[in-house]
Amino acid sequence: MRNLIFILALLTAISFGVLPIPHSAQAGLVSAPQLREQMPQVPESCPVTKPPTPAFVPPSPYPNETTPGSLWFGTNKLWILLRTDGTWQGLPQWPDGTFRQKLFWWHEGYDLRETLHPPLKVTGKRLGSPAPPLQSGVSHGWTNDESHPFITNGINLPALGCWKITGRYADAELSFVVWVMK
């Protein structure tokens, strides 16, 4: 059951652009030189979040596996699944010109039965260039079983570029930096 939840979360993340669809699933196997050429270029001025050493591993009973190209980032109090290259690419653009991203957050002890709309607050600031702050929607709890609930939150970014995103829930705060590109 734990694997089922992990798979569903990953499929949802892929559908919203949080995680890349593996190149081998798109068009056969890709050689390493071709893969390097396809990797997005992040400007040195954007300090994207890199995989930590040692890697963060979610506490049991939460899933600890990821797909290639992704990593768990955070602490037992609040964590998220990010891309290892620090980018969000190909986000849908809404009629108002903003770029939509759906985020999935985990908090040890979060109980969906007690809080359907958890008070997760997500803020964001563009680094290096002025832009209005991101818009954050209402957070929702979600799960496919009683042991692994997580929190979803949709954000709208008013511009492409380098963004510092911060989530706050209960007594936890987690920030990361991403390069948002077309």
Where on the chain are the PLM-derived regions?
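Signal peptide processing junction and immediate N-terminal pro/mature segment
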Residues: 18-27
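Contiguous segments within soluble domain cores/interaction surfaces
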Residues: 28-158, 162-182
